[in-house]
Structure formats: structure tokens, C-alpha cells
């Protein structure tokens, strides 16, 4: 009897089961039919007809990994190119090894500067420093400068007040920073501090940054500064860093990483960096083009996914963007005013979504603008983009 039961069970288990695919299952099955090239190309994207406004989702999925390996070290953009890499998007480390020659500076997001007491400072995050990666990058990209971002972290208003009002404090801060650069074989730093301090201490902050830059220069190191957009997004109001501050710091700093992205908000979905706003931010900073070569126009290699029914948004990096294209096969729309692509899709729970993410065309337009304005570019960040983006640089 038991043998008969086992045979019946085996027959049922092996018999075909006929079911109806749900809509979500059907989409998943359909997504498998979208192809992705895994091999490199012998031509850059500019020569393959891929830099277009009438973009198709299928084309992005098919081509995004297929960069031109033969020209991976050739530069197409003459200005300075700063690229950020982060520990949480490790693909950026690999990108830098392959395309390092296209950059003038690489800024790993490793370090924080903290005040521990009177005339006592510490640079934390050194556990993230990868000397082997630094050696590998420098080996393949001669002349490339590695300038980690140095974030002023956990500073209180009193910390700023005590430091900015004291030459001894500023001197100790500068010594600490220079010594870390020497010990770790850095070429300088990209300092991020401007957004952390209220406007009433700008004079003191300019003095401190000038002193720090002079100390770094004496050690043959570079000093760059992250700055917010000169025009507040969504308004015609000046931002926290204006022409006045730029004129004072431009002679002493080596570059300014201008954050020309994150224009739209969750409550007002839209482009990441409308072209007219990007242009205005540069022109307001330096209307007479005196120091334009030191401005590094910010390019976002990430996008935003807006859930319009919830007034919410989430950052979109390359892998998620490609998966969304596979799952929904949306119609890509070119916003000619902002010079960005976007698309819409629907989710059963969160309803309508709008996604703005950079494309070859939107990046090419911004690189052309940078050439026209005489500025460099800074990219946030290399691990978030698509591999074929780098053909443009």
C-alpha cells in the first residue's frame, strides 16, 4: 500500500502544473527578454549613435555596460575633471582603475575632521583609506591627484566660534591636516565645511580656509572647497556662497566643487539640474570669467525616483535604474527646457512614479556647457553611474 502511495505522489509531483501569470510575474518574465551587452565596444558612444534625445529604454539596457575599452584612457574634455568615490558604492573604485586617465583629481569620501578640545583635532575615517588602490590608480593614470574629501563633522557652533577667533586653533588645525596628508600620501583635500556654518561667521571661515590653503600649498598639496549652488534651487535668491566669497577665495584655493544638482524636491518633482539654472550658478559666481577654470561644475551620476502620490523621493543609482527599465519598459521623454530625460511608471501600492536619471545626451549637453563657460566638472559619484557614461569624458 505504501509503495502505491509513493508512486501516486511521484506522479503528481512530476505532472505539469498550469497556472496564469499575474501582471507582476508577466513583467518579470518579459524583462528577461531585454538584452544587455557584456562585451566592450571598439567605438565610443559618440560614434555609435547613442547620444540622442529620442532615447529608448531597450537601448539603455542593451548598451550601458559596453564602453569603448580601446579609448578608456583618452580624454575628450580638456578642463579639470574631479570624480568622487565612496565606500558604499564600491564600483567607483573599479571605474577609477579603468578610466583614471580621464580625471585630473579623484576624491575618495573617506575622512572627517573633528575637534576634540582646545587646539586638539583628529582626522577620522582613516580605516577606509586603501593604499593599494591608490597605488594601482596612480600607476595607470600619471599625473592624477588623489584628494580625499575632508568633512567637518560634529562641530558645534561653539567649536566654530572658538576656532575661527583663534590663530592658535587655526594653526593646529592646519598642522593636523597637513600631517595626515603627508602620512597617507595624499595630494591634498577637498574640504567640505561651508554648509555646516551659519552665515554670520563667513568672514572667519574665509580666513581659516585661506590659512589652511596656504599651509597645504607650502607642503605642495592641493586645497579645494565644496560649495553650494550660487542660486537657491527653485528661487531667484542668492545662495550661501556668492560672488563676494568666491572673489576672496578664488586666488588662494585650487578649485571649487560646485553642487549644481538636487534642484527639485519631493513636493515638487522635476529635473535634477535644469540647464538654465546650472548656467546661472556659474555666471553669478564669476560674471567676468576671471577664475572660471577653478570652478568644477557639479554633474550628478545618480537620479531621483519620485512617488507623486506620497510626496516622497528616493535616490536612484545605476543598477536600480536599469532594473526599473527592465521591469517597466517605460517611454523615455526628453525635457527640452531642462535638457534631461525622464520617464513614468506605476506601482500597485505607491501609484505613479516619475524618474529623472542622467543619460548620455543630458551629460553631453552639460559637458558642452562646461566647455562654453570655461569651467571644469565634478562628478558625484562614480559608483552610481553607467559604465558607458565615461566615453564622454
Curated annotation (Swiss-Prot):
Q: Does the keyword Cytoplasm apply?
A: no
Q: Which GO terms describe its cellular component?
A: endomembrane system; extracellular exosome; extracellular region; extracellular space; late endosome; lysosomal lumen; lysosome; membrane
Q: Where in the cell is it found?
A: Secreted; Lysosome
Kindly give the InterPro entries that the UniProt entry links to this protein.
Chitinase_II/V-like_cat, Chitinase_insertion_sf, Glyco_hydro18_cat, Glycoside_hydrolase_SF
Keywords of this entry: Immunity, Innate immunity, Lysosome, Secreted, Signal
Q: Which Pfam families match?
A: Glyco_hydro_18
Q: Which residues form the signal peptide?
A: 1-19
Which stretches make up the GH18 domain?
A: 79-393
Which family, according to the similarity comment? Belongs to the glycosyl hydrolase 18 family.
Matching entries from PANTHER family are given as: CHITINASE DOMAIN-CONTAINING PROTEIN 1, CHITINASE DOMAIN-CONTAINING PROTEIN 1 FAMILY MEMBER
Function per UniProt: Saccharide- and LPS-binding protein with possible roles in pathogen sensing and endotoxin neutralization. Ligand-binding specificity relates to the length of the oligosaccharides, with preference for chitotetraose (in vitro).
Q: How does it assemble?
A: Interacts with STAB1.
Name by which UniProt lists this protein: Chitinase domain-containing protein 1
Organism of this sequence: Homo sapiens
